[in-house]
Amino acid sequence: MAKILQTQAITADTFRTNADTRFSESAFGEQVVAQELAFVQAAPVYDLLPSNFRAYTATGGTAGAENKMFKASTGTSAGGYGAIQSFRSLNYKPGEGAIAKFTALFESNAASSWQGAGLVNLGDELSFGYNGTSFGIWYRHNGLAEVRTITVTGAAGGSENLTLTLNGTAETVPLTSGTVEHNAYEIADYINASVAGWDADQLDDTVIISASSDGAKAGTYSFSSATATGTIAQNKAGVTKTSEFVAEADWNGEAVSIDPTKGNVFKIRYQYLGFGAIYFDIEDPSTGRFKTVHTIQYANDHTIPSLGNPSMKFGIYAVNLTNTSNLIVRSGSCGLFVDGQRVSTRNPRGVVNSQSVGTSFTNILTLRNRRTYNGYINQVEIQPLLLDISSESGSKNFEIEVRSTTDTGVEQNFTNAGTNLVSDVDKSSVTVTSGRLLATAVVAPQTNTIIDLKALGI
């Protein structure tokens, strides 16, 4: 018996009617497909915290890796917490969506506690977790760190102690004779090594300090020393992030039945652009497919952007407020992506320096991505492109090393690399041996060597 094959002419209107309406079209009616670009991918399968992750603990809390999972716990004291964050953020680009995929389980819950797993930065959070005994979604946004600038206006005439008061707490900072830049380095070095709750960057004769948490830090700030003089000015006032918790019973999407004490697969997607929608997805255990369980429908309803900074890190945390039972959050792995290619949108910049060197490794150039930018915590990435080294020696080879480090262990004097840039540069002639070796090359007399830094993925 012959079978009749029915056909239908496919037109643009037919496609729009019959196809998945979530497909995007170009200005010419062509289907647009976005390719995910990974920024963070991690799985602690060797029970070690990856080197590009950081752990935070207090009052008996712990953070690390166990049973091939990230683990954060509160311990059994009120105020205890454990947290883990990726060092790198997904680098949001306007017009490209951002995605987090991860697994998580929450072993238990208790009143007067917080737990979460998802996207975080100092002032924002998009996560699944617990508010006390209620499972749901955390949406925290638009928090700011206190940022101030200490300017050394007069150098110390000898060895003396600076009384530096930060947010009402007096610190005793040893100073020695030298330049204002030298004293600024001493102050920044002391703060980073000895003052909890603050980070510091020396820049010429100034020290830019930023609080390591959001919220107002409106106490007393002062600079008092025997001969050294200085001022402290506020760049940005700290603001406590707005916290919103949407309990599972109040979600507005598809229903998915899960047990949060078991490992589940989660996904968080956001358009940003300032006012785009934010989607929270959970894998349906019965089908292995994601369902959107809740959407923050932000457009046409607000007058300020949904996030203070859309470049976010992966993180898990467990926090005891007044609770004293041990709460544990685990995650098997995570991936952070943007929907699109990595394309530079700014003109490249360069710096140059000449240095006489001997038989010890001597700094020629040090580049730094600063902690703050225009008074805000900096989440922008710098991408080194190339290093061109030439030798004026007529008879000797010399070796060049490229190292990555957060602290050379020697005094350096950073200056601006250019106007309105996040990068600083140091050209001090100091001996440097610390840090992770990234590349090395030998430069022959009267020649030059080029190292492709972009290929190293620094």
Where are these regions (language model features)?
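Extended, beta-strand-rich, solvent-exposed assembly scaffolds of outer structural proteins
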Residues: L144-A145, T149-S225, K236
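Exposed beta-sheet edge/beta-hairpin loop segments within beta-rich domains
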Residues: G154, G253-K262, R269-Q271, T449-I458
